[in-house]
Design a protein with these regions (language model features):
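Edge beta-strands of extracellular beta-sandwich domains
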Residues: 112-121
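Short, solvent-exposed, Trp/other aromatic-anchored flexible loops in extracytoplasmic proteins
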Residues: 71-100, 106-111
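The feature marks short-to-medium sequence segments in extracytoplasmic or secretory-pathway proteins
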Residues: 46, 55-80
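N-terminal signal peptide c-region/cleavage motif recognized by signal peptidases
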Residues: 17-20
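A short, structured loop/turn motif at beta-sheet edges
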Residues: 34-38, 62-69, 93-99
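Bacterial N-terminal signal peptides that target proteins for export
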Residues: 1-9
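Residue-level recognition of well-ordered beta-strand positions that form the cores
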Residues: 43-47, 61, 90, 104-106
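Short, surface-exposed binding/anchoring microloops in extracellular/periplasmic proteins
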Residues: 23-58
């Protein structure tokens, strides 16, 4: 019986840890196509262990290096079977003095905290 209890403990620990480390949404790729009027279109690839409506990547955001939000792309449903996935957001106005932006992703359980990307803009 002790062996069964140990196996149960190991199995439940593994399940708990795997759910805990499903963790934050990561930005794995970003392309930015900017026009001369400081307006950019972004294609962002996000990876997250989506697990239905209770835990999924629900948005990504373009920010200045100082942390000011410039644009948010809401993700309206889980992508359980499509990982990583790419979504676009166009016509993002970039301040004239901004030459780099940070893109970060969020998930519905852990909020922000995963891998983010810094992107140099050619305007």
């Amino acid at each position: 019986m002790a062996v069964v209890n140990r196996l149960f403990l190991i199995a439940t620990s593994f399940v708990f840890l795997s759910q805990a480390f499903a963790g934050e949404a990561d930005v794995v790729d970003v392309t930015a196509n900017c026009r001369s009027n400081s307006v950019c279109d972004f294609n962002v690839t996000v990876r997250h262990a989506d697990d239905g409506w209770d835990h999924y990547a629900d948005r990504w955001e373009v920010m200045t290096l100082a942390g000011k939000s410039l644009a948010v792309r809401e993700l309206l449903h889980p992508h359980d079977d499509e990982q990583p996935f790419t979504r676009s957001l166009g016509d993002v106005k970039i301040p004239d003095d901004v030459t780099e932006v940070v893109v970060r992703a969020r998930d519905s359980r852990h909020q922000y905290g995963g891998i983010l990307k810094t992107v140099k803009l050619s305007k």
